[in-house]
């Protein structure tokens, strides 16, 4: 994997991976921590750089970011973020999708400053995340 391949893939489609990393690291995560976790995950084939940073193993990705915790992930279709304690949620709009991290029914992390999918779209599916000691 070339470094430019990595950056191109990360720029195009790492939103779900970044949500998992943010969930594992918490609200004080630094850009350097995001980069380090994403790079390590790519090196270990936990994310697939050839498929726009597709997450192959969410739990392994969060373990790379923060190995001191225990994680579980449950996939479900949703139509709203209300009631979601912690989860990555996919919004869809006009044929495009974007993932954000939701805590207590509110978006707490969005890797894009301005996402049309989130602004105009609807919640379609979620990855409910549980974190333990």
Pin down the residues of each PLM region.
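Phenylalanine-focused residue identity feature
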Residues: 6-7, 34-35, 54, 109, ...
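Histidine-centered active-site/metal-ligand motif
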Residues: 98
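Conserved active-site-adjacent core of cysteine acyl-enzyme catalytic domains
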Residues: 26, 39-94, 103-112, 117-124
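Active-site nucleophile-adjacent alpha helix/oxyanion-hole segment immediately C-terminal to the catalytic cysteine
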Residues: 1-48
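Short, structured beta-strand segments at or near domain termini in extracellular proteins/domains
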Residues: 121-133
């Amino acid at each position: 994997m070339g470094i430019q391949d990595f950056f191109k893939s990360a720029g195009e489609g790492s939103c779900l991976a970044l949500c998992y990393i943010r969930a594992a690291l918490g609200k004080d995560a630094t850009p350097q921590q995001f980069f380090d976790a994403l790079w390590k995950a790519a090196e270990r084939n936990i994310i697939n750089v050839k498929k726009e940073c597709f997450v192959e193993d969410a739990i392994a990705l969060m373990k790379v970011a923060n190995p001191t915790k225990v994680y579980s992930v449950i996939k479900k279709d949703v139509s709203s973020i209300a009631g979601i304690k912690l989860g990555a949620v996919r919004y869809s709009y006009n044929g495009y999708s974007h993932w954000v991290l939701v805590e207590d029914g509110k978006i707490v992390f969005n890797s894009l400053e301005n996402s049309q999918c989130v602004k105009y779209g609807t919640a379609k599916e979620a990855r409910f995340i549980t974190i333990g000691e």
